[in-house]
């Protein structure tokens, strides 16, 4: 089973970073108001990036690192092409 870290852009322009084993299911939870407290009332969302990891520990470590980055650093990270984060994906979601 893969473990994912993702970044959502909320309708107010803020970014939310989270962890899940099923990105689609988790975004639906956020959209229904049953996701993280932070995202309630901030939809619709746009999925900005996802990273896949083989273990929960690795994913949780990465989530912690990303959550502690400034917005500018997150934007730089998401815009990277190649390198260790080449599996970053950009998708639109409502």
Curated annotation (Swiss-Prot):
Domain GIY-YIG per the UniProt entry, residue ranges: 1-76
Any Pfam family the entry gives: GIY-YIG
Record InterPro entries: GIY-YIG_endonuc (IPR000305), GIY-YIG_endonuc_sf (IPR035901), UPF0213_domain (IPR050190)
Superkingdom of origin: Bacteria
Family: Belongs to the UPF0213 family.
Protein name: UPF0213 protein BH0048
Lineage, uppermost ranks: Bacteria, Bacillati, Bacillota, Bacilli, Bacillales
């Amino acid at each position: 089973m893969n473990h994912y870290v993702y970044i959502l852009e909320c309708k107010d322009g803020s970014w939310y970073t989270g962890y899940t084993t099923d990105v689609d299911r988790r975004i639906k939870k956020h959209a229904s108001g049953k996701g993280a407290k932070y995202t309630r009332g901030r939809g619709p969302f746009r999925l900005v990036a996802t990273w896949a990891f083989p273990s929960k520990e690795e994913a949780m470590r990465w989530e912690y690192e990303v959550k502690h980055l400034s917005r500018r650093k997150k934007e730089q990270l998401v815009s990277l092409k190649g390198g260790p984060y080449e599996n970053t994906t950009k998708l639109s979601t409502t």
